[in-house]
Amino acid sequence: MDMTHSGNSNEIRWYAGIPVGSNPLILLDFFTIMVISAVLCWGILLLAQFYFDGHVALPHLYGAAVIAFDLCLLFSVFYVIVSFIVMRNGYVARYRLDMTGAHCENIKCRPKSTVPGFFHFCSYPVAEPQTYNRCVEKHVSWADVSSFAELRSLRVLILKGRRGTLMRIYCPDSQKYETVLTFLNDRIASERS
């Protein structure tokens, strides 16, 4: 696990394993999408019934609800298959915080956890991946960050801008969380002054 300070306090780097299928933040997003999808599906089916038949009765309400529920169930099964079988409940993120901003590379590979267990709820320490297929990079400039939110129990810091969440920063342990929190407080304070 690379948790380097690059010789000075101007840069912090580390790797973190991020659970997918058991991550509370991802599950919350997924649940929200499922509720919105179910309501939209139910509403669209009722509008279609009204358009084609001119009225909506109680059996139509029930039938639309069953179809909306079945659709959500299908999406949930697909989510479980992708999360636990395709992605093996995790991916690796390489974070770098420096004077220019926050940088994150999401690396698609099999995370080699340095702590035992397959079913993690929070981010966890991982060894540096030797090989990987793909990686997606995201950069957030400190000028775009207006504030950040702490989710201490999950060891996550959320960078916020004018349009909402810019980046989630996952920390593999409490020590790294405190280091990153101090760094963010210093950077945001210096950007405001």
Model regions and ranges:
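Conserved beta-hairpin
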Residues: 78-134
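Short amphipathic alpha-helical segments, especially helix-boundary/capping motifs
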Residues: 57-58, 75-77, 119-122, 154-158
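Canonical hydrophobic alpha-helical transmembrane segment
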Residues: 65-83
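Terminal and domain-flanking low-complexity segments
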Residues: 1-12, 139-193
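Eukaryotic phosphoinositide-binding membrane-targeting regions
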Residues: 19, 132, 138
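Membrane-interfacial loop-to-transmembrane-helix junctions in polytopic alpha-helical membrane proteins
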Residues: 61-64, 88
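N-terminal membrane-targeting/pre-transmembrane regions
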Residues: 1-62
